[in-house]
Amino acid sequence: CDGISIRTSKLSKEIIDSAKNLKVISRHGVGYDNIDLEATKQNNITLAITATANAQAVAEHVLFMLFSIAKRNNMYNETVKTGKFSDRTKLPKTIELWNKNILIAGFGRIGKCLLKKCKGLEMNIFVYDPFVSEEEIKKVGGTKINDLNESLNKMDAISIHMPLNENTKHLINYEMIKKMKKNCILINAARGGIINEEDLNKALNEDLIFGAGLDVFEKEPPSLDNPLLKNEKAFLSPHSAVFTEECLSRMGIETVQNIIDFFDNKLEKSKIVKIS
């Protein structure tokens, strides 16, 4: 074949090497840790992603998780449904997002989209991304953070939007979580391996942060004995941030269009993954 459209299946070196006519791989999504990049590079194959399709859906999902945790959605919902309405004054208090500090770690399309939505909530927005200039971040209403570790104790919410690679694997560990504010909400809708799940579970059990929202896991699906599945301070979803009707439609169209555009020499550079 000359082109492959792929979602979550593994595209190994063996498969890529055996596809002698393969010229382009179009990923149904923006992550590509399921594709052997070295083999892709060695075989001079172009890797494209649906760069413009999923930002709105993922940014909305991040806010959904942020609100759900801040407002203790699970607990308050269960209180009403189990006939304990009168216990409302005894429940742990919720928190507001207005005027709170949020750190967006990774400032690609999703991070930029999230910033716009957080501005509507009148949050104070900080951005960590070594590859984006202070001027560009300031232009859209954010404040650039140069040292991730030093900023953690000032943030009320942290949302991860980085790729998973050797530099970001287990970037968020126990020591880093210990530096966060006790009322901090940690959200990951990027890639599971960026957060050390064992460390996160320990930190949640020790009440080091307010709560965590995960749409992604180190192992998917997570095993049933993963303690985060039973942790009341963890708000979880099944890697479903993009599963809106609108987003899936956009992604499907863009995946195919990327292949067509490649062979028509019209594929946008912003949709091509630069493999170093």
PLM region spans:
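A short helix->loop->beta-strand "cap" motif at the edges of active sites that frequently abuts
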Residues: 19-24, 43-46, 122-123, 182-184, ...
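Short, Asp-centered acidic motifs that coordinate Mg2+ and/or phosphate
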Residues: 2-3, 24, 157, 185, ...
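Phosphate-coordination loops involved in phosphoryl transfer and adenosine-cofactor binding
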Residues: 22, 98-101, 174, 183
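An N-terminal-biased, well-structured beta-alpha scaffold segment characteristic
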Residues: 1-48, 153, 173
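Rossmann-like adenosine-cofactor binding region
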Residues: 12-16, 132-227
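Rossmann-like dinucleotide-binding domain for NAD(H)/NADP(H)
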Residues: 47, 183-276
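Phosphate-binding beta-alpha-beta segment of Rossmann-like dinucleotide-binding domains, i.e.
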Residues: 43, 51-101, 113-116, 120
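Glycine-rich Rossmann-fold phosphate-binding loop(s) that bind the pyrophosphate
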Residues: 107-108
